[in-house]
């Protein structure tokens, strides 16, 4: 479904001339339907797609990644921005509940990127066919609860962030694998 800005309901976004639109998908089915449009639009399956994975609370660095993704897929391509605060990256007692959840502001920022006339300070204008924002809940990402199969990150799990947050890297690998599968 497409998202109006600034409201968080599901309805079309008016696009700037020559630009695509923002679609908000909250469920696996909505994401699949949004991605299927690419398949119907190009029978060869050749619509370029880029995925920018985030936990939301978007800032200029995220917008730069989205702009680069759009540059790489070109005007006929699709950029998928995922916004998901992954509970598997947080151990008990960590800051999961304190992590900012700013979906409406994030979508507004992405819409501004899509509509901007250009220039690094105003976010570069995206010449991209479509921008899909996939913002699932934990229940959507992990419909059967915690995954039955876990990915072992190996020795990296005990250094860097893993030295103080032992579940962090396993959670990151799990969400990346799941998002890659859902956006393929």
What spans do the regions from the language model cover?
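Nucleotidyltransferase catalytic core that binds NTPs
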Residues: 2-184
